[in-house]
Regions:
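C-terminal-biased regions
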Residues: 1-104
Length: 104
């Protein structure tokens, strides 16, 4: 399923692969379950958004390229569900400012 996901939605595939790499297969499996359980694209995107929001603390543990993929997936979620856009924008801004402050 991971390889198929990488072809179908590369950014989400990147996030799933990285979660497995950092030994968080449980969260990767939740994302795959959201894909499998959705009968419509809205259900799939909504389920993925819920999983990523519930586990947003993992964002600090992933690589920069994967963080960019995570942001791209969340951008897709926010396009589908615009109510969360402002919240996600603020979260991304906070992360960027935090990373800049931590970079020597």
């Amino acid at each position: 399923m991971d390889a198929e996901l990488q072809r179908w939605w590369p950014d989400l595939g990147t996030v799933v692969a990285e979660l497995r790499r950092i030994d968080r297969s449980d969260v990767a499996d939740l994302l795959l379950d959201a894909v499998r359980a959705g009968a419509t694209s809205s259900e799939i995107i909504g389920g993925i958004g819920i999983v990523l929001r519930d586990h947003r603390g993992l964002y600090t543990q992933i690589s920069r390229p994967t963080a960019a993929a995570w942001d791209a997936v969340m951008a897709d979620v926010n396009r589908a569900y615009p109510v969360g856009r402002l919240s996600h924008w603020f979260t991304r801004l906070t992360r960027r400012l935090t990373r800049r402050a931590q970079t020597p």
